[in-house]
A protein has these predicted regions:
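Residues at the starts of beta-strands that form the adenosine-phosphate
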Residues: 82-83
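A charged, well-structured terminal subsegment
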Residues: 28-52, 203-207, 211-214, 218-223
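Rossmann-like dinucleotide-binding domain for NAD(H)/NADP(H)
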Residues: 10-11, 140-142, 146-229
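Glycine-rich NAD(P)-binding loop of Rossmann-like domains
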Residues: 39-72, 98-103
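Rossmann-like adenosine-cofactor binding region
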Residues: 90-184
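Phosphate/diphosphate ligand-binding glycine-rich loop within oxidoreductases
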Residues: 1-40
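Gly/Ala-rich phosphate-binding loop of Rossmann-like dinucleotide-binding domains
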Residues: 74, 78, 161-162
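Short, flexible hinge/linker loops that cap or flank conserved catalytic cores
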Residues: 53-57, 78, 135-136, 185
Length: 229
């Protein structure tokens, strides 16, 4: 902040991880709708377990947070035949899908089959998804968090998953990281836990460096910079 106050132009690498994070979200959804954890368990037990699966096509997904990551999640989910509804504090009009304001979160929860959190952590969003929002989701709905763990009431999430109200969850972020060994999230059969690594790929630094080089060229040409803080 001090550099900005002194007139120094500061930029970020925002968007450099949008593609791999969105792909991770789709991985969660494909795995959960097909009960991949259950199939892997059956494979380990050498048990032939045929079952019907749920299709993504036709499901409605709510994407809370429409920055570069949220927009890419909306784009990929639409490619799978899903209906994305975005959500952000202020609708700008350039979003890739229908987008609602954040004050309609409870209504969004009642509307969607899948709720994805992709919103930054702030004083306003801390604890945003509490027991009432989780309870408003349809029975069997799926929940994904690739934002920050503190955006959701983790105890309420465990209750919603343990009771069977939620059909499953894909979680890359947690209130405490690393996730404590005694957390029930480790052993719930309808939960996929990943270690806050959805945006970490072999190309992560390459994409960030591409943004830096583009901004360097823009600076020399006197053009507006990308991701200006």
């Amino acid at each position: 902040r001090g550099m900005i106050d002194r007139g120094v132009q500061v930029t970020t690498s925002s968007g450099s991880s949008a593609s791999p994070i969105a792909q991770t979200v789709m991985m969660y959804l494909l795995a959960l709708t097909r009960d991949l954890p259950g199939w892997l368990q059956a494979q380990a037990e050498r048990r032939w377990d045929q079952r019907a699966i749920t299709e993504l096509d036709g499901l409605t997904v709510g994407v809370v947070g429409m920055g570069p990551i949220g927009c890419e999640i909306a784009r990929l989910s639409a490619a799978f035949g899903m209906r994305p509804i975005g959500m952000r504090r202020t609708v700008r009009g350039d979003e890739p899908c229908e987008t609602w304001t954040l004050d309609r979160l409870a209504e969004l929860a009642r509307t969607v089959d899948v709720l994805v959190l992709a919103i930054p952590l702030s004083g306003e969003t801390r604890g945003l998804v509490d027991a009432s929002i989780l309870g408003a989701l349809r029975p069997g709905a799926l929940f994904v968090n690739i934002a920050r763990g503190e955006v959701v009431d983790e105890d309420a999430l465990v209750d919603a998953l343990s009771s069977g109200h939620l059909g499953g969850a894909g979680l890359d972020v947690f209130a405490v990281e690393p996730l404590p060994e005694d957390s029930p999230l480790w052993t719930l059969p309808n939960v996929i836990v990943t270690p806050h690594s959805s945006g970490t790929t072999t190309r992560s630094h390459e994409r960030a460096f591409e943004i830096f080089l583009d901004n360097l060229s823009r600076r020399e040409a006197g053009e507006p910079l990308r991701n200006l803080a």
